[in-house]
Amino acid sequence: MSEKQVFSTEWAGKTLSVEVGQLAKQASGAALIRYGDTVVLTAAVGSKKPRPGDFFPLTVNYEEKMYSVGKVPGGFLKREGRPSDRATLTARLIDRPIRPLFAEGFRNEVQITSTVFSVDQDCSPEMAAMLGSSVALVISDIPFEGPIAGVDVGRIDGKYVINPTIEQAEKSDISLTVAGTYDAINMVEAGAKEVSEEAMLEAIMFGHEEIKRLCEFQQQIIAAVGKEKREIELFVSDPELEAEVKAASEGKMKVAIKTEEKKAREAAIEEVKEEILESYKAKELENETEILSEVAHILEMIEKDEMRRLISQDKIRPDGRKVNEIRPLSSEVGMLPRVHGSGLFTRGQTQALSVCTLAPLREHQIIDGLGTEEYKRFMHHYNFPQFSVGETGPRRAPGRREIGHGALGERALQYVIPSEEDFPYTIRLVSEVLESNGSSSQASICGSTLAMLDAGVPIKAPVAGIAMGLVKLGDDYTILSDIQGMEDHFGDMDFKVAGTKDGITALQMDIKIDGLSRQILDEALTQAKEGRLHILEHLTSTISAPREELSAYAPKIITLNIKPEKIKDVIGPGGKQINAIIEETGVKIDIEQDGTVYIASQDQAMNRKAIAIIEDIVREVEVGEVYTGKVRRIEKFGAFVELFKGTDGLVHISELAHERVGKVEDILKLGDEVTVKVIEVDHQGRVNLSRKALLEKKEQPEGDKKPQAEKKFYPKTKKPESK
């Protein structure tokens, strides 16, 4: 495969080409994907020998290069650093459909790296990387049961679109990524604008048709350049040891698993495991470490099989619930007195405390990535401390799981956030998981809804989330509502659905089997809707509408619209004017290019004061208007009167009174307040005022009347005489 080979097809109206044999030739498999002007290189490498441990060590990396969009990285070092949240989420997106397609017992390390070389904003580098990951694996000698493919799906005016452009995505009411094999779907990630379950299912199936075509395209590549798969020794338990451990523990394990409370159940199961392990330690076997590791693995498989049998055959769950039953719910708002809004949501032994913070728009998050988004004013962050599951350990920076759960909650709530015009605030939600026994990401969505309502955020509708599960034995399957940790760990599906009473706003599906049929997806969505509506009813019984007033500790934001050409007057030279306003009032001021001014402060009186100052600065005088101002300067020809801050005008001496005035000081003194009328604004913007226009004219005898002198306003500069 030393010679470069190119395979091409059409993808959503753009040319898709896969190049192999030229780049990254020392990797187990590599492919350069060109999609429009987007270029992504994906390389896959598999270790020759299994790694120690009882898990499959798969690592997926998605590396964004700023040069791909013609940017230099920000910061002091001017080079790419830790992955962005988007890169982390994309790596998870690629990992999820690939992981289920490695054989059970496969322990060799596999690393997949996608490097973004060039980005065409209308040709998704994420989808190119997912395709490249599949191609790199299927043409390598790594035993992978693919190919897979992924596509983005949108819906515009009821019509479904594959890989929508930026312009199309803005008009779409569905933002869906779906991945799978030729035969089935195995990963879904979606955000939506309250769409129905039927519409979402149609979008998923529409995407799967395109996935089939891309899988067929990859089969052509495999036939041409695919390597023979290497022989891998899969981890398999010793049959005699397995039978021996099963005979000693199965009966006790069945009893332990039926313990309803999580901690008590864990203790009962652990007791069974410890008893069996101790019995093998007592035998003082020659290869004790390996035997004990294998026994521990067998015991976990017995635990898994019994839980699955209990659900599949008896239709009873470990905690005694029915398959569609939701755990007991409780919620509370306003727990934290000094924050802007808070909500505590508890579902069984899963609990999330969400806090809403409101801030001026200037505190939005700046996005410095490969996309077109420059900033975002709504954020949801998810924290999962180890005490939430009764464990100890070091606290680290948010990992992939926390970033992913935070993003899912953000997507679920994004649609109901009021527009910037209706609610000019930056909104940050933080969900602290205090207790976890499954579905903590969905608890964070429910808690965040409560927190925003408590903060007075005028959301369009409350949002609730629920996690669905699946146990599939052969053709028999059981769908579970509101899964707990054990059902997530040993089950076949984690299907999270969030939305309002009117429709879905977010969806995420991961499975551990090859794929799901349309029938299972349909039933899962229908059952999820029933659960979601039940939870929404509970949430609205706690708080049904946003608080009418914001917290006393939240900034109060007032908006003012000024003419764009007046922005420079408000800012002043070198920011002198705006800084003076901020210093005098203590407010925060943001000015948009269209002339929208946002003024924020906890003190409404200071907000109003700042508004008054700015209104004075941008105010424009109108001919015929009457003002009361102060005399700021006196000249021989008249007095200059400040009408309002930053604007003054001239009262010519002839406009002071109806009678002749010898000296300006005979009528006005410096600092006097005087009421005047605007009689002219000349072409240079100079304002001429009159005092006498507001005075009653005294009648004079006909013989005493004198011809009026010609009015002279601002003195004109004499032109230099020509020599």
From Swiss-Prot:
Compartments, record wording: Cytoplasm
Keywords carried by this UniProt record: Cytoplasm, Magnesium, Metal-binding, Nucleotidyltransferase, RNA-binding, Transferase
Domain of life: Bacteria
Positions of Mg(2+) binding: 488, 494
EC supergroup of this enzyme: transferase
Annotated ranges, domain S1 motif: 624-692
GO cellular component, one term: cytosol
Annotated PROSITE patterns: KH_TYPE_1, S1
Record's compositionally biased regions (Basic and acidic residues): 693-723
GO function terms (MF aspect): 3'-5'-RNA exonuclease activity; magnesium ion binding; polyribonucleotide nucleotidyltransferase activity; RNA binding
Cofactor: Mg(2+)
Reactions that this protein is recorded to catalyse: RNA(n+1) + phosphate = RNA(n) + a ribonucleoside 5'-diphosphate
KH domain boundaries: 555-614
Protein function: Involved in mRNA degradation. Catalyzes the phosphorolysis of single-stranded polyribonucleotides processively in the 3'- to 5'-direction.
Listed name of the protein: Polyribonucleotide nucleotidyltransferase
Gene label: pnp
